[in-house]
Amino acid sequence: XVRDAYIADDKNCVYTCASN
């Protein structure tokens, strides 16, 4: 998913991980 794509990015992971 799309979420996986964001997780790949450390910067975006902060938002994605927090949301997830």
Curated annotation (Swiss-Prot):
Keywords carried by this UniProt record: Amidation, Disulfide bond, Ion channel impairing toxin, Neurotoxin, Secreted, Toxin, Voltage-gated sodium channel impairing toxin
Residue numbers marked as site, Important for toxin potency but not for selectivity for individual Nav channel subtype (Nav1.6/SCN8A and Nav1.7/SCN9A): 6
Pfam families: Toxin_3 (PF00537)
Highest taxon, organism lineage: Eukaryota
LCN-type CS-alpha/beta domain sequence ranges: 3-20
Entry GO CC: extracellular region
Tissue spec. comment: Expressed by the venom gland.
Location(s) in or outside the cell: Secreted
InterPro entries given in the database record: LCN-type_CS_alpha_beta_dom, Scorpion_toxinL/defensin
GO molecular function: sodium channel inhibitor activity; toxin activity
Record's keyword annotation contains Protein transport: no
Motif (Important for toxin selectivity for individual Nav channel subtype (Nav1.6/SCN8A and Nav1.7/SCN9A), but not for toxin potency): 9-11
Homology family: Belongs to the long (4 C-C) scorpion toxin superfamily. Sodium channel inhibitor family. Alpha subfamily.
Function text: Alpha toxins bind voltage-independently at site-3 of sodium channels and inhibit the inactivation of the activated channels. The fraction to which this protein belongs exhibits low toxicity and induces transient paralysis in all insects tested (the crickets A.domesticus).
UniProt note: domains: Has the structural arrangement of an alpha-helix connected to antiparallel beta-sheets by disulfide bonds (CS-alpha/beta).
Protein name from the UniProt record: Toxin Bl-3
